[in-house]
Amino acid sequence: MIKVAISGYYGFKNFGDEAILSVLVNHLKTFENADITVFSSDIEYTEKTYGVKAVKRFNLKDVIKTIQNCDVLVSGGGSLLQDVTSLKSLIYYAFIIALGLLFNKKVIIFAQGIGPLNSNIAQNIVKNLLKYCSYVTVRDENSLKLLEKLGVKSELVCDPIYSLDIKSVPQNGVIGVQLREFKTMNFE
């Protein structure tokens, strides 16, 4: 049996993050003996929706116990390692990764968007953690270039959302569009 712990922005019912978790869990379930535990803000929702175990993401005792008992820690997808939202968010996800490394677990950074990393502290945190991870994949060229600049080896993969089984998504005739300003990107 392989025990996998998954860290990300899960249980907040953010469509993009939940879709990424769905793809990741479905892939892991193709391995016959996968025992999956997700760090979530809403344990009941995550367990019911994905058929996995879940622990409260801010329950330090449960998070540490889960990481100590897992074989692999997966961090991702989404854009978890960035300091635009807040440095606190980056520190939380970095702390989870650091625990995995501290307990000598295989740590996989899964299809993340890395950055922007505006502060030197954010750049140093990401650089000094990710270089020790077992496998780092990113979902876009900018993330690949940023990690290359920081001296972190990574691989470019497609965004996991493209693997989502859209047949399982309820069809109600509504299309949603989310507009977001990216101050660090020039689209001209």
Annotate each predicted stretch with a short phrase.
Residues 1-188:
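Active-site anion-handling motifs in enzyme catalytic cores
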